[in-house]
């Protein structure tokens, strides 16, 4: 347990983290990924190169230091970290590596005059406190997944039963367990962890489950990203009949029980978890609005399916917006999703539940629009594909 003196030292470093936290964490990652190859599969190198991952962790460390006396306020952040760790199979033996590299980075970046032995001892104790909390929470999730019907721990082998192009950029993979045993149920909005060997190097990635749980198979729908190592591998080199290693479903961005109108607002590949949410919500009586934005019809995945669902369920309405329509495209609006368009498409009653996913600028825009249109902030839910970040309201 941290002493009062150690808490005071942690809080005293907050101004340094506010101005130099990102540089410190960048140095931390450079050290850890360079010297400990066993943890490299846990990290997406594209997120390292873009700075998104160091930025996200720097913000997390800062939040931890600011709330060192009120850790209960970090509950939502801890839940996201736990789910992300579980999806990639972060294990107790990984934590000492992180702690060693973090303390080295603090000393090497801040210097010995600031990062004294007392400061390092305080941060060492603070890190161990956080590590113990995460290890315990993650173990409870691992155990629950293993004990549930159809559940498992670690990796499970799946076969690609079907591979289907959904648009010019997105392809779906239908995955069935090789052992033929029942399959763990998941909540709409969750994702699975995928472990691959690409040219002799292990990599791990998360992909949203794009169809509701059915006990037989999982479906992921993957966008081919320019320069994306894993997405291009899946598109080009994984075929029907191939086998893949999966970790159990995880994630805290899930459809919540409610009888309020449901609004799903997506852009691009952000549509994938919303598809599972839509399927799950269909038996309910509440009105559903499905709003999807794409550049044009060629990259608009699942359009036919959405239209069929709307035709068969009177409580469902859909609206499509194309920012760069091609000749012959048909959409309800063109250009970016404006506040005026969104106002027309939302239910008149603003006491609704909104879930939105897509590129970060899109989500920031949607969040502002929903606030301007009177949708309560606590009823607006969103998720990042990749490291979490703040959305300016």
Swiss-Prot record:
PROSITE patterns to which the protein is assigned, alphabetical: FAD_FR, GLOBIN
Top-rank lineage group of the source organism: Bacteria
Residues the record marks as active site: 95, 138
Reactions catalysed according to its record: 2 nitric oxide + NADPH + 2 O2 = 2 nitrate + NADP(+) + H(+); 2 nitric oxide + NADH + 2 O2 = 2 nitrate + NAD(+) + H(+)
All residue ranges annotated as the FAD-binding FR-type domain in the record: 153-256
Residues with site note (Involved in heme-bound ligand stabilization and O-O bond activation): 29
Domain Globin, chain residue ranges per copy: 1-139
GO cellular component: cytoplasm
Cofactor note: Binds 1 heme b (iron(II)-protoporphyrin IX) group per subunit. Binds 1 FAD per subunit.
Gene3D superfamilies tied to this protein: Globins, Nucleotide-binding domain of ferredoxin-NADP reductase (FNR) module, Translation factors
Keywords tagged on the record: Detoxification, FAD, Flavoprotein, Heme, Iron, Metal-binding, NAD, NADP, Oxidoreductase, Oxygen transport, Transport
EC number per UniProt: 1.14.12.17
Residues holding FAD: 191, 205-208, 384-387
GO BP: any one term: cellular response to nitrosative stress
Site (Influences the redox potential of the prosthetic heme and FAD groups): 84, 383
Names of required cofactors: heme b; FAD
Molecular-function annotations in GO: FAD binding; heme binding; metal ion binding; nitric oxide dioxygenase NAD(P)H activity; oxygen binding; oxygen carrier activity
Keyword Transport among UniProt keywords: yes
Domain remark text: Consists of two distinct domains; an N-terminal heme-containing oxygen-binding domain and a C-terminal reductase domain with binding sites for FAD and NAD(P)H.
Function as written in the Swiss-Prot or TrEMBL entry: Is involved in NO detoxification in an aerobic process, termed nitric oxide dioxygenase (NOD) reaction that utilizes O(2) and NAD(P)H to convert NO to nitrate, which protects the bacterium from various noxious nitrogen compounds. Therefore, plays a central role in the inducible response to nitrosative stress.
Family from the record: Belongs to the globin family. Two-domain flavohemoproteins subfamily.
Protein's recorded name: Flavohemoprotein
């Amino acid at each position: 347990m941290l002493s009062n003196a150690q808490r005071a030292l942690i809080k005293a470093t907050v101004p340094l983290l506010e101005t130099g936290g990102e540089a410190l964490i960048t140095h931390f990652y450079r050290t850890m990924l360079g010297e400990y190859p066993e943890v490299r599969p846990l990290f997406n190198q594209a997120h390292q190169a873009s700075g998104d991952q160091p930025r996200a962790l720097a913000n997390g460390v800062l939040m931890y230091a600011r709330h060192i006396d009120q850790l209960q306020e970090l509950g939502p952040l801890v839940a996201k970290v736990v789910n992300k760790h579980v999806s990639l199979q972060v294990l107790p033996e990984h934590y000492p590596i992180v702690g060693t590299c973090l303390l080295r980075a603090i000393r090497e970046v801040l210097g010995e005059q600031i990062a004294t032995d007392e400061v390092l001892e305080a941060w060492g104790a603070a890190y161990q406190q956080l590590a113990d909390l995460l290890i315990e929470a993650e173990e409870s999730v691992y155990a629950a997944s293993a004990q549930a019907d159809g559940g498992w721990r670690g990796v499970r082998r799946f076969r690609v039963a079907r591979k289907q192009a959904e648009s010019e950029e997105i392809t779906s993979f239908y995955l069935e367990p090789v052992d033929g045993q029942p399959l763990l149920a998941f909540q709409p909005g969750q994702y699975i962890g995928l472990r691959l060997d690409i040219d002799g190097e292990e990599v791990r990635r998360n992909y949203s489950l794009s169809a509701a749980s059915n006990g037989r198979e999982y479906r992921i729908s993957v966008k081919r990203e320019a320069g994306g190592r894993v997405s291009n591998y899946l598109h080009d080199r994984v075929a029907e009949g191939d086998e893949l290693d999966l970790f159990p479903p995880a994630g805290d961005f899930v459809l919540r029980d409610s009888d309020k109108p449901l609004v799903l607002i997506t852009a691009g590949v952000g549509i994938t978890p919303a598809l599972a949410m839509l399927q799950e919500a269909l038996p309910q009586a509440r009105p559903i609005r499905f709003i999807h934005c794409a550049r044009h019809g060629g990259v608009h995945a699942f359009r036919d399916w959405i239209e069929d669902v709307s035709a068969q369920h009177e409580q469902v309405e859909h609206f499509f917006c194309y920012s760069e329509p091609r000749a012959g495209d048909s959409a309800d609006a063109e250009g970016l999703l404006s506040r005026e368009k969104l106002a027309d498409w939302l239910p008149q009653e603003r006491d609704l539940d909104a879930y939105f996913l897509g590129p970060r600028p899109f989500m920031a825009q949607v969040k502002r629009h929903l606030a301007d249109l009177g949708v309560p902030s606590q009823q607006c839910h969103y998720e990042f594909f990749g490291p979490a970040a703040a959305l300016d309201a």
